């Protein structure tokens, strides 16, 4: 490595293959990659917005509700709009994970050491697959089982069960974020430990 003196204040250490670029060049690259990723997420959101009602209806149909769809209640139309757009955002982010991961990798690659590259590549790949698996697991298997268990535990004679659609969605979404953040944090720590 050689020492490069930039001005009279800053001193950097560069590897032989490194190039000294001004901070503005890095900022321009970051803005360009963020712009591309944002446009991609917005396009995915537009696509998901066209089918979100059908997807939510299909998901609600998979839930083991006591007496079927007649037990679903919508207490606030504005909350339902928020729910729909939250679902669109979640689906857009999930379907954009490969592009977001690729953009992060391409931006970070030149500045990383080989061990850091291995860690980041593994984290992006395993984290992306883990994220998709956890979301499918929570929404498709875990949440319906929780509703079944709750129905068995709370049966009061003469009292009908009614479910707030927005509350069901918000609870599934909260579980998703909680388990996802814990899983990604554990993955980051495990990879840091394994790869040094």
What residue spans do the PLM features occupy?
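Membrane topogenic/interface segments and analogous intrinsically disordered interaction regions
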Residues: 1-196
């Amino acid at each position: 490595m050689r020492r490069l003196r930039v001005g009279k204040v800053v001193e950097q250490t560069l590897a032989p293959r490194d190039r000294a670029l001004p901070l503005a060049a890095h900022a321009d690259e970051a803005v360009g990659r963020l712009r591309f990723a944002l446009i991609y997420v917005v396009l995915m959101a537009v696509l998901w917005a066209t089918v979100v009602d059908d997807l939510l209806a299909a998901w609600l149909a998979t839930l083991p509700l006591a007496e079927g769809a007649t037990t679903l209640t919508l207490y606030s139309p504005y909350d339902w709009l928020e729910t729909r757009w939250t679902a669109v955002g979640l689906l857009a982010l999930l379907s954009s994970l490969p592009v977001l991961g690729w953009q992060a990798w391409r931006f970070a690659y030149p500045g990383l050491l080989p061990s850091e590259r291995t860690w980041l590549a593994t984290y992006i790949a395993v984290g992306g697959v883990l994220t998709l698996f956890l979301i499918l697991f929570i929404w498709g298997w875990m949440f319906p089982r929780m509703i079944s268990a709750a129905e068995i535990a709370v049966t009061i004679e003469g009292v009908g069960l009614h479910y707030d659609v927005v509350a069901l969605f918000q609870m599934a979404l909260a579980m998703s974020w909680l388990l996802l953040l814990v899983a990604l944090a554990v993955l980051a720590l495990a990879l840091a430990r394994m790869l040094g």
